[in-house]
UniProtKB/Swiss-Prot annotation:
Protein name: Protein naked cuticle homolog 1
Amino acid composition bias (Basic residues), ranges on this chain: 324-336, 422-440
Compositional bias (Low complexity): 272-293
Compositionally biased tracts (Basic and acidic residues): 211-221
Location (main, coarse): membrane
Subcellular location as annotated: Cell membrane; Cytoplasm
Binding-site residues, Ca(2+): D142, D144, N146, K148, D153
Gene: nkd1
Record SUPFAM superfamilies: EF-hand
Gene Ontology MF, one: calcium ion binding
Biased composition (Pro residues): 352-362
Function of the protein: Cell autonomous antagonist of the canonical Wnt signaling pathway. May activate a second Wnt signaling pathway that controls planar cell polarity.
Biological source species: Danio rerio (Zebrafish)
Gene Ontology cellular-component annotations: cytoplasm; plasma membrane
Amino acid sequence: MGKLHSKHAAICKARESPEGDSFVVNACLARKGLDDWMVKQKYYCSSSRVDQRDCQQKNNCELSPRDPLDEGYAEGISDEHYRLEVALPPEKTDSCSVEERMQGTEGSATVGPHKQLQFEELECAVSVEEDNRQEWTFTLYDFDNNGKVTREDITSLLHTIYEVVDASVNHSPSSSKTLRVKLSVAPDSSQRWKNCTQTNTDTPNPKHKGEKCIEDSKTSEKKSRAFLRRYHAEHHSQQGCQRHCVDENLERRNHYLDLAGIENYTSRFGTAAPATEPAKPTHATRSSNQSRSRSQEPENGQVHPAHHRRSQTMSTDPPAILTRHTHALRSPKTHRTPPTQASAGRVMRRGAPPPPSVPNQTPPHQSSGPYRRHKQRPKEALHYRALGPSVTSGPVLEKEHVRDLPSLVLYEGGLAQVVQRHEHHHHHEHHHHYHHFYQS
């Protein structure tokens, strides 16, 4: 039936390597020892029969493609056994000593019973550099000998590994092969020790030149420490930057809130401002200026036609009066005044100005003629019907203050307009009533 259609071909697949023909073996290390594992690998690669017990070992062998016209095809497989690349997955064991892994090998230098070299993981890799040279790399992870590892321990361990490898490799009588055994020991995470040594010795075997060395794990530790140092430095710098940014944002937000005047907005406009309150600096936002100018549109519409008939003079009132005046303009009650209320307010201001101490229960137009009383009654009815019970003495007193002031300064878009309310209303109602007097 042939090798390509047998059970062996099911787990052995052809592979082309750019370096040439090679044989790749992935195997799990048995606890019986390295010798049993090497015997099994040699049996898999030299035989075509694989039973069910061997399939459970999860060994994958890949045969490189060869010329089918080659007469020595079976001999080529035995020759290819020298070209091995073994990648062992790490196997975690519970305190497995080197004696248990290395027992049963002929001529092996056993470690003394008082020496219990323990390691958690073992990794073995074999690479083929040339036709007559192989390199075997063993890595022991979490290697610990109670924190005391001597040169003799490492040397005996390396000799044991080399004898196991030498016994597992087929020797060709016609050619010599160089085996390089490399041992890497990674220290235990709980212990920091650096007693790893490196040895390079040749074996007395005339057919093989053994090169033995030990890799120190200082480079890996330096890399890990540098990585941790860099991580901590970046972490601390990021924390400092974030803290600085948060403080800067809070200061900027408080500064903008102070500029907008939002902190004391409700306490400032909830009740009438006292006369002793200092004047607020004129750094209000432009949107608030526009909203205040829109609230005065019914009065500003009558201000502009008569504004060119009088000179523009700057107000020289005391600070207390200006403060009360600006608060009367900024009051939310004034913002919500409907047009009927504004017109009624103008009607109430048409009469003679009463003294400031007189309350506003008495209508100010009683001293006028009968035609004024007749025309102002429906407007007063509409005014009191629109206001209802919400009319209090607060806005009325504020309007009295506004009427008594000789001039008013409004800021809109950076341009100052001097509006003389009292003089304007005097001219306007004189012209208006003069016209009505002649019509009637």
